[in-house]
């Protein structure tokens, strides 16, 4: 992916978006309140003609995409800017894809790799997963200002750690038994950096970020969450991008409290433990579980406000039909998943 990261990253915008371009800015409200002091220095100047500057909404759904499509004069824009978290960015990417207008991203949290990928994860109006939209192109450029990200609520970095570790576990699982082409083999190798450096850096990164300290651990973790994960997503065969960690997340969204009360990467990280248990990857499970315990990522159903003895069939039904399980080394059934969930309930690392 094309990206610039650093304390003056936003000053690089002029190198990529010609002066006097017509632009539209769409943002998440809370994110923009923090980011505006940085973005205004470059975007709200005589260099650019701003045709729209508005909140995108609150979720990645087609109602919010349509709001962008209906902005007066939007078709004459030279560039769309998405300033916010993954749902804001996915919404703007989806709109840009329909309009054939280049999208530039300014992530305000390090929670997913949405700022650099060429997919948009769309939900229905109830917040239940709907579909993954394959876009024609990724964002033209991503501008990562670490001072914005380190001042965001710490829960987003925490969830991003969970989402990022899943990439390595899922891609190696999905690609197992296949003869890989060069780019997929390279992408899966890069994916190791979504896991091992995170194991090493995560605890210190969270401690430092709580104090707004831009340590090496914080910067490496931000880069691995946004850029390394995005690299894997962009260059491997799309069928290798996910597996049970994400499929179970999408299944869990049938319970409305999951989308309302839990973050994407937080829930995905639980799915990673379930996948490792199902696949009998006990050494990796032990390492991952230990980090979850250390930093408070979920390790059991109760951490997601679910009970061991409740009926999970609605979740499991939605999980097994998810597209992320179309290309896996063996058939993943409801029974296999439930068995792994119950084993995880009894597991103690």
Predicted regions, residues:
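A short, small-residue-rich loop immediately preceding and capping a beta-strand
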Residues: 72-110
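C-terminal charged capping/lid subdomain of soluble metabolic enzymes
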Residues: 281-349
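A glycine/threonine-rich phosphate-anchoring loop and its flanking beta-alpha core
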Residues: 98-190
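Active-site segments that bind and position negatively charged phosphate/pyrophosphate groups
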Residues: 180-291
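ATP/NTP phosphate-donor binding region
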Residues: 1-79, 301
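Solvent-exposed alpha-helices and their adjacent loops that cap or buttress functional pockets
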Residues: 16-17, 73-75, 96, 131-137, ...
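Short glycine/serine/threonine-rich phosphate/pyrophosphate-binding segments
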Residues: 33-36, 87-94, 112-116, 241
């Amino acid at each position: 992916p094309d990206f610039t990261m650093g304390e003056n990253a936003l000053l690089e915008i002029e190198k990529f978006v010609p002066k006097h371009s017509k632009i539209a800015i769409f943002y998440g409200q809370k994110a923009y309140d923090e980011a505006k002091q940085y973005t205004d220095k470059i975007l709200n100047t005589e260099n650019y003609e701003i045709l729209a500057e508005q909140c995108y909404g609150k979720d990645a759904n087609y109602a919010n995409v349509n709001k962008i499509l209906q902005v007066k004069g939007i078709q004459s824009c030279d560039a769309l800017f998405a300033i916010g978290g993954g749902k804001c960015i996915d919404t703007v990417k989806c709109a840009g894809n329909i309009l054939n207008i280049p999208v530039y991203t300014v992530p305000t949290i390090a929670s997913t790799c949405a700022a650099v990928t060429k997919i948009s994860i769309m939900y229905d109006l109830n917040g239940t997963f709907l579909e993954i939209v394959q876009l024609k192109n990724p964002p033209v450029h991503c501008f990562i200002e670490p001072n914005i990200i380190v001042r965001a609520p710490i829960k987003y970095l925490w969830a991003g750690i969970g989402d990022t570790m899943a990439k390595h576990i899922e891609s190696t699982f999905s690609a197992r038994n296949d003869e890989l082409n060069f780019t997929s083999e390279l992408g899966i190798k890069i994916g190791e950096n979504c896991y091992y450096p995170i194991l090493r850096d995560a605890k210190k990164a969270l401690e430092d970020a709580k104090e707004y300290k831009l340590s090496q651990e914080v910067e490496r973790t931000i880069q691995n969450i946004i850029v390394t994960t995005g690299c894997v997503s962009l260059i491997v065969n799309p069928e290798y991008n996910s597996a049970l960690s994400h499929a179970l997340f999408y299944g869990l969204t049938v319970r409305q409290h999951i989308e309302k009360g839990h973050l994407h990467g937080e829930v995905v990280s639980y799915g990673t433990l379930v996948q490792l248990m199902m696949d009998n990857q006990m050494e990796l499970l032990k390492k991952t579980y230990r980090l979850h315990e250390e930093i408070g990522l979920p390790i059991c159903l109760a951490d997601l406000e679910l009970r061991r003895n409740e009926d999970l069939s609605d979740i499991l039904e939605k999980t097994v039909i998810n597209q992320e399980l179309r290309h896996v080394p063996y058939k993943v059934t409801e029974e296999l998943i439930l068995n792994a969930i119950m084993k995880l309930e009894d597991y103690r690392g």
